[in-house]
Amino acid sequence: YDVESTDEDGWKKILVFLTFQHINFKEFISILCMWLKGRPKKSCITIAGVPDSGKSMFAYSLIKFLNGSVLSFANSKSHFWLQPLTECKAALIDDVTLPCWDYVDTFLRNALDGNAICIDCKHRAPVQTKCPPLLLTSNYDPRLHGVDSGGG
């Protein structure tokens, strides 16, 4: 990762944000390290909470810092919407809604577990690759409501 072009005091802003959100900094760093290494069953982080709490701002900043890609569930009808996963170090799916959670639960379980997946690529043969670490943001927490409960 290219950290030469970053703000030297940027970590202080992150610390302030995490403290404001009542997140233990040491625990977060430990989880982030496992996430970046792509450890099985530890390769997906979901940031869920109330609207306008800074989830997306934090996630976009982190993905930009990591030179990652942003995926949009709105493009999920295309066979190629996951193609950026073949070329990035980390990826973000922002604002995961209930239909997106259903899709993830049905079709992306191997990706979330950090296992190899097959991705259709435009003008190329399908590519089998290990899914990069995924970061998801959502106003809906499936741990509280369940994926198929219809609540939100």
UniProtKB/Swiss-Prot annotation:
It is found in: Host nucleus. ATP binds at residues 49-56. Its main location: host cell. Its EC number is 5.6.2.4. It catalyses: Couples ATP hydrolysis with the unwinding of duplex DNA by translocating in the 3'-5' direction; ATP + H2O = ADP + phosphate + H(+). InterPro entries: Helicase_SF3_DNA-vir, P-loop_NTPase, PPV_DNA_helicase_E1_C. GO terms for cellular component: host cell nucleus. Residues 23-152 form the SF3 helicase domain. Coiled coil: none annotated. The keyword Hydrolase applies. GO terms for biological process: DNA replication. Keywords: ATP-binding, DNA replication, DNA-binding, Early protein, Helicase, Host nucleus, Hydrolase, Isomerase, Nucleotide-binding. GO terms for molecular function: ATP binding; ATP hydrolysis activity; DNA binding; DNA helicase activity. ATP-dependent DNA 3'-5' helicase required for initiation of viral DNA replication. It forms a complex with the viral E2 protein. The E1-E2 complex binds to the replication origin which contains binding sites for both proteins. During the initial step, a dimer of E1 interacts with a dimer of protein E2 leading to a complex that binds the viral origin of replication with high specificity. Then, a second dimer of E1 displaces the E2 dimer in an ATP-dependent manner to form the E1 tetramer. Belongs to the papillomaviridae E1 protein family. This is Replication protein E1. It comes from Avian papillomavirus fpv-l. The gene is E1.
